[in-house]
């Protein structure tokens, strides 16, 4: 929200955020409880940003809507990668749809976004993503 309303932006090489991996971090655990917490956290952020979209001035709304769309794409991606389940993906899509977050907006944010949006808009596309994305992640 700060960057959306900023009148001047200064660039710097300083790191504003840096993540240190450690054993106690929720992002390093793959148990069901940790995954559920991560997904709940993402949904909470999406809900809060969606709430803000309706309350910020129109000039700020476009940037915030883009962020919501990109986070929604990332959420769907994480469900595909971590859950690897058609049932979980369908539940995710249905939940996002009920909140007005799906289908993803028809915007040209990036090539990755455009293709992901097109693929997630069809059952066949979602099945292809579900069967290929987890394999691509392993190769990297």
Which residues are covered by each model-predicted region?
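Nucleotide-sugar-dependent glycosyltransferase catalytic core
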Residues: 8-44
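Amphipathic alpha-helical repeat scaffolds of TPR domains
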Residues: 66-78
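C-terminal, non-catalytic tails of nucleotide-sugar-dependent glycosyltransferases
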Residues: 41-63, 101-106
């Amino acid at each position: 929200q700060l960057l959306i309303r900023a009148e001047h932006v200064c660039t710097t090489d300083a790191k504003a955020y840096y993540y240190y991996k450690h054993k106690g971090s929720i992002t390093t655990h793959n148990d069901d409880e940790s995954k559920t917490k991560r997904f709940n956290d993402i949904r909470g952020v999406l809900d809060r940003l969606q709430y803000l979209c309706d309350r910020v001035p129109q000039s700020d709304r476009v940037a915030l809507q883009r962020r919501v769309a990109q986070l929604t794409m990332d959420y769907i991606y994480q469900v595909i990668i971590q859950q690897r389940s058609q049932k979980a993906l369908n539940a995710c899509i249905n939940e996002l749809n009920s909140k007005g977050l799906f289908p993803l907006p028809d915007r040209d944010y990036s090539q990755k976004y455009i293709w992901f949006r097109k693929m997630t808009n069809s059952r066949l596309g979602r099945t292809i993503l579900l069967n290929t994305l987890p394999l691509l992640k392993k190769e990297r």
